[in-house]
Amino acid sequence: MRRAVCPGSFDPITNGHLDIIARASSLYDEVYVAVMINQAKKGLFEIEERIDLIRRVTAEYGNVRVESFHGLLVDFCKQREIPAIVKGLRAVSDFDYELQMAQMNNGLSGVETLFIPTNPTYSFLSSSLVKEVATWGGDVAHLVPPLVLEALTERLRNR
């Protein structure tokens, strides 16, 4: 079985993330979405909320599993016998950082990284940008799934 992982914080998941997950889903038999736990950062959504949102918006893909992870991504991969990491690249600036990470991960464990160019529609998109625009009342409906927009609107209203 061909397995891959799409890692990230997904706070919140965006249409850009979903595009990469969907494309990975068509290339691999099983795709894990690994939601990073970073105790140093207080996210807008708790880990459990992110996992729930991702599970709901990826439900149409029968080969996508969503789990959290803490620590090194290569350890997550080793525990689940995942030989490949799938990363979306928005711009050259992403490549510089992601290449270093790919080389480190490969050196640590032999896991390979597959880079997928982001759909040009989402080349500017990040979770941070979505949160910033939404915080100031901007329209992000075209940047996140409706379910996520609803959760984001509710969360910002209650802040």
Curated annotation (Swiss-Prot):
The record marks H17 as: Transition state stabilizer. ATP binds at S9, F10, H17, G88, L89, R90, E98, Y122, S123, F124, L125, S126, S127, S128. Keywords: ATP-binding, Coenzyme A biosynthesis, Cytoplasm, Magnesium, Nucleotide-binding, Nucleotidyltransferase, Transferase. Its cofactor is Mg(2+). One of its GO terms (molecular function) is pantetheine-phosphate adenylyltransferase activity. Pfam families: CTP_transf_like (PF01467). One of its GO terms (cellular component) is cytoplasm. It comes from the Bacteria. GO terms for biological process: coenzyme A biosynthetic process. The keyword Nucleotide-binding applies. It is an enzyme of class 2 (transferase). InterPro entries: Cyt_trans-like, PPAT, Rossmann-like_a/b/a_fold. Its EC number is 2.7.7.3. Substrate binds at S9, K41, L73, K87. Gene3D superfamilies: HUPs. It catalyses: (R)-4'-phosphopantetheine + ATP + H(+) = 3'-dephospho-CoA + diphosphate. Pathway: Cofactor biosynthesis; coenzyme A biosynthesis; CoA from (R)-pantothenate: step 4/5. It is found in: Cytoplasm. Homohexamer. Reversibly transfers an adenylyl group from ATP to 4'-phosphopantetheine, yielding dephospho-CoA (dPCoA) and pyrophosphate. NCBIfam families: coaD_prev_kdtB (TIGR01510), cyt_tran_rel (TIGR00125). PANTHER family: PHOSPHOPANTETHEINE ADENYLYLTRANSFERASE (PTHR21342:SF1). Belongs to the bacterial CoaD family. This is Phosphopantetheine adenylyltransferase. It comes from Streptomyces coelicolor (strain ATCC BAA-471 / A3(2) / M145).
